[in-house]
Amino acid sequence: MDRYKAHDMPLGWLLPNDGYGAGYGQTDTLDGNIANLKSLADYARKNGVEIGLWTQSDLHPKPEISALLQRDIVKEVRDAGVRVLKTDVAWVGAGYSFGLNGITDVAQIMTYYGNNSRPFIISLDGWAGTQRYAGIWSGDQTGGVWEYIRFHIPTYIGSGLSGQPNICSDMDGIFGGKNPLVNVRDFQWKTFTPMELNMDGWGANEKYPHAFGEPYTSINRWYLKLKSELLPYAYSIAEESVSGLPMIRAMFLEYPNPYTLGKATQYQFLYGPYFLVAPVYQETRADKEGNDVRHGIYLPEGQWIDYFTGDLYEGGKIYNDVDAPLWKLPVFVKNGAIIPMANPSNNVSEINPNLRIYELYPHGSTSFTTYDDDGVTEEYRTGRGVRTLVESRVDGKNNVTVTVHPAVGDFAGFQKKKATEFRINVTQKPSGVSAKIGENSINLAEANSLEDFKSRENVYFYDRAPNLNRFATKGSDFEKKVIAGNPQLLVKLAAADITAAPTVLSVEGFRFEPAEKYRLSSGALTAPANAAVTEENAAAYTLKPTWDAVPNADFYEIEFGGMLYTTIKGTEFLFEDLEAETPYSFKVRAANRDGHSAWTAVSAKTKANPLEFAIPGIEGETSVENQGSSLAKLFDFKEKDVWHTKHDAKAVPFDLVMDLKTINWLEKFHYVPREDGGNGTLLKGAVYYSMDRENWTKAGTFQWDKNGDVKIFGFKDAPTARYIKLHVTESAGDYGSGREIYVFKVPGTESYLPGDINNDGKIDRNDLTSYINYTGLRKGDSDFEGYISNGDINKNGLIDAYDISVVATQLEDEADQPQEEADKKDEEEDKAVGDDEKKKAAEEAKKKVRVDGTLLLSADKKRYSRGDAVKVSVKGRNLRLVNALSFALP
């Protein structure tokens, strides 16, 4: 809390961890720990922060549990003042009832023992009904990579479509990190989501918003402050989501058409009725500072305004090459929007209850109903809340009338007397401004400056170029950067009873006509020449049309699938997520301020992808020598090179063992022999599979013709395995050879990499961190089942040294380099000996790589009394290649 305050960062709540060996108190009793928690909660509330718990323990006391991990949710709520609960792995449970009953119990306790407090629960997982008491967080994921942002966008959209509007995820992941560009982009788009959650202590770097220094600290602070300003809008659409549309809305919910009803808009969403958010989720044309562009932004019918620059976009098109410098999230406001706001704050205690702010983009006739209540109790369920209807109308003479109707309703702490501030987006100074409350006209004075405006009431000010960069770190280079938005008319009215009469603002001579952003050049345009999809630009799921540049063109447009892709700056454009082996047609034209050229038609067909479910990264080993390093060529997805056993040496019978590196549901494998079916073509043998390379199950036999045709072996009942063994008994010329072996998993199934405990598809330090934190967790512990149990590689029901060793020995900076040096040394030794000696050396090396030795445990006494210390001595005898030891009490 002190750290966030020192860096002027918003912070709403803090969740100490009650488990994973941490606990929230370090005393010898549960009551002592509750008192410890209360002292933290008291300090937090003095600083405007609420306290919750990140829990993986039971809710109620159990005598057999140590004080460190004891729980008493009643005392935590009643005595310590806990108001937030984040549940974890242990809360998923078996079936529906476990988790649902748990959050129901907590919700009722929070209300009953917490002075009618409103339950705030965030759960790892859930089912139908979870939304009644809990929101959802997406679980332990790895940040620092663009994939983290990419997959979360449709995840959030899908949550809303599933009836769960309250969705969040760890900022930049709980694991990983060390990529400030991804970090900033994650903070940006999640400004327009219900909640943001920092999970620190598990990643490659601290997960604070200021972890990377400048300019990232300044940008993250800007977006967190913006989120605080948008709280009245967010709260209003949150209340709507109780019985209406979710806060994060799939495009088709508001704009259903053939384009939005598919996957085409899965990387953008509506935040309430007025904001359209298109997160930066990949590098498109980024420079080293992270300045980039965003393709594929579909703006529906109507007019849309860049929230930061004020540029105006006509809807019904798909915009590309949209500027996205590092500081800028592509976010658009629908023309006509009415956005209730608050003063920027670091927590809700800093929000001015005597001020209401409305930002407007007047266009036609629009309305929005704001909602507010006490924010902390269950009284809203009985109707204790306040609604305010705001209407905006632009007439045929460009006069704007904004009517804020009397607030309706009441709640404890509601301040009826409020000042009202309007922010009207314009492009030139209006000719007249007036206001009245009920029948009473307000005498408005024009302020001389923004500072003058802030210090007075019943005043207006034309802000010609608002500097949006208001929260940069003092003295930083980013503070010097002026980021100008479109002009605004600012109006502030003195405090009045907002329930008594309507407040009406009238603006004469309203104009919002931004300068054209894209159409800048003039001159005749010719149809693009040489438009085509070349062979190298066609793939199974993508096509990239290219064309020659056209003189006088500002940008290009492509018509595809009944949609217009516009503002394409270059002479190529990539279409993704297409169907394999499917013909497609495009039309390309050039555009400038004078219009557009004639169309040029392009047709192309996507290629086939027969290897979609072929497993990559396979490594092989044979029981006989091979010609050089050719065995690697059997699994490199290149059919032009060949594997061959050692020339002039009989190979059969021999074994070929394939390490898939991942555990898969096996469907089949393809053996691609030499094109002529010549020497080494495999003809007869048997196939086995295994999880551990020690216990093998026979899958069947093969008998293949001696020709160059692809040979197919199918697995019955889709067994699960990591290893496949071919025992070859007959081959052409008694050798072994082949161009490729493709092993296919069952279509649509996932591969699991042993040791990848955080399930991000790779072994890295994030996995090691998790293993260390979960060391000693065993079957029967509440949070063992699930992805933690997947980390039990040797399947002994315990996260132990064996499991940790599997990961630690694969880390590049600690294991690979010494092994590379050892391999180099082995190669040098091989050069100095003959073939026979090499074989003997290889056999000896195999013996040496086996872990061996004995552990002897002895106690210092034969008998012990209560309270005695037990000393156990451990000695190793003839230990070989041991890099870790596990000890645990039964």
Question: What residue spans do the PLM features occupy?
Answer:
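Beta-strand-rich modules
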Residues: F575-D594
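Aromatic, loop-rich ligand-recognition surfaces of beta-strand-rich domains
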Residues: A580, D636-K698, N707-Y752
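Low-complexity, serine/threonine/proline/glycine-rich extracellular segments that form mucin-like
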Residues: Y864-P890
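Cellulosome-associated attachment modules in secreted, modular CAZymes
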Residues: V746-Y864, K871, F887
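Surface-exposed beta-strand/loop patches in extracellular or lumenal glycoproteins
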Residues: T284-E301, G409-S431, L885-L889
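Pro/Thr/Ser/Gly-rich low-complexity, intrinsically disordered linker/stalk tracts
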Residues: L520-P551, A580, A598-P610
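Catalytic-domain carbohydrate-binding cleft regions of carbohydrate-active enzymes
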Residues: M1-K328, K334
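Accessory, solvent-exposed terminal regions and/or long lumenal/extracellular loops of proteins
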Residues: N335-N440, R456-N458, Y462-S521
